[in-house]
Amino acid sequence: MIDIAALSLDYWDDLMVRMAHHSTAIEGNTLSQGDTKSLLLDGYIPRAMDLREMHEVLNYKRFMDFLQQSLTKGRALSLDFIKEVHAVLCKDAIEGVAGRFKEIPNLVVGADFVPTPPYLVSTDLQNWLLDLAAQLAAAKSAEDKIAAICRQHIRFERIHPFSDGNGRVGRALIVYSCLQEKEDPIVIPVEERKRYMNYLNTEDLQGFVAFAKELQKEEEERLRLFCAKG
């Protein structure tokens, strides 16, 4: 269990850079982690780059402010909260309207399922929120909490509530839920994209939870080092 109030500024910066780089890279963004650091922490554009890719990364600066403020206020997940996350992360980075649920049906390339139709998105997400809250309330261990968060992430990506940006929103909700529960955040590295996508595509909850626990172990070590540094 972690103390959110005790996390160092350096750790928050590190988390922001890694979330921005890995989550956007999983979706195909070509900027390096060094490029991401330059944009977010150093405040300069290190080279010529695609404008959309730059906005995808820069949006994480606003998102980290949003995340910290929401944690401080104790904000619970809600439909409006999810739309706000999308609005922040997808500003100037998608063709659709950031912060608005999809209005036409969409498909996931290569998937063997059909996402929730637009007219059912709000209902399905409301049930998703209720189920997540119930599972977390019933959790008797940290592993139970992580299983609930992973289970609901798989389900969120199958609802696919937005026209674009579903993956980065879903992964941001993983981090927020972990921090809400005082658990080490889970940052999925782009190097493990195939493994991660396989867990989603096959709905392999057991494998996904084991993977998440591996990532938490790595995060725990990063937290320890940043605390020692501070």
Report residues per predicted region:
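FIC/Doc superfamily catalytic core
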Residues: 1-230
